[in-house]
Amino acid sequence: FYAALTQYLGYKANSDEYRVMGLSAYGEPKYKEIFEKMVRFDEGNIINDNSFFAYHLGGDICYSEKFIEYFGPPCSKEECVDEKKYKDIAASGQELLNDLMVKIARWLRMKTGIQNLSIAGGVGLNSVANGKIYESKIFKDIWIQPAAYDAGCSIGCAFYIWNQLLNKKREFIMTHAYWGSEYKNDEYESAIKISKLSYEYYSNIE
């Protein structure tokens, strides 16, 4: 449902959901009851009312005419930022996601008895919903895969083969996500000078 909401608000589905999450902070969840008609969680099952959606029909549009009947015509990026109504729609969708995530987390804790939670998948990048799970104190520890979206599938595949299929010992523990390129100060300084930018140097950045 969040992908449909994202597209309805003028953004790219399955890509710009983070923009909707950010936009939701500027609205009020006035339309939450409508979103509750679309999707609910019941005893381990996520139940969608597909009459609100069109993504399963094979086209490019994720939301249906029924979605439009409830909320009105879709908006452009500019309109959703400027008009309060669309901010409220974003806030309502986010509020439902928060509730769903907490309900799922509570159900998992009850079913498994495990005190630690690991979150992955695209929705795992929704820091607002993750924060609600954290605040609920359902789990003792929560770990969120930094590459929670599709790119992280390769990590999961590699670990599955190594640990499960090859039965190899788990030697690597991920303690940070800072795996990018590393540069020295003189390289930074050279790039800044080439770009003719002003700068200040601090020896202590703590």
Task: Show which residues each predicted segment covers.
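Short acidic/glycine-rich loops and adjacent helix/strand connectors
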Residues: 1-206
